Amino acid sequence: MFDAMTDAVTQDMSKILQTKAADLSGERLRNVEAALDATAQQIRGHWSAASDQAARSDFSVLHDGITAARNIVVHIASMR
């Protein structure tokens, strides 16, 4: 459903601190952030197309979770 969430991205997310330590350029965390951002945009599209309030509510909760995950990734990426 969310194409940006590839196996590589989800594996990097599951071990985010190890990913940060191994990725001196920061590219992998930027890829995770971009995937989460793209997924949030897709969710907004699904929310707009939802036909009932329950579905919109579900998509809102999902969007909030993805946005929180993105914020965590940004925070971890900025840690020294």
Curated annotation (Swiss-Prot):
Induction annotation: Expression is controlled by the hrpD operon promoter phrpD51. Positively regulated by HrpX.
Disruption phenotype: Expression of hpa2, hpa1 and hpaB is undetectable in the mutant, and the expression levels of hrcC and hrcT are reduced. The mutant is deficient in secretion of Hpa2, Hpa1 and HpaB-dependent T3SS effectors, such as the TAL effector AvrXa27. Mutation also affects expression of several Xrp-coding genes.
TM region(s), chain numbering: none
Top-level taxon of origin: Bacteria
NCBIfam families to which the protein is assigned, alphabetical: HrpD6
Free-text function comment from the UniProt entry: Involved in the regulation of several genes of the hrp-hrc-hpa cluster, which encodes a type III secretion system (T3SS). Upregulates the expression of hpa2, hpa1 and hpaB and partially controls the expression of hrcC and hrcT. Controls the secretion of the T3SS TAL effector AvrXa27. Also regulates the expression of several HrpX-regulated protein (Xrp) genes. Has no influence on hrpG or hrpX expression.
Protein name (database record): Regulatory protein HrpD6
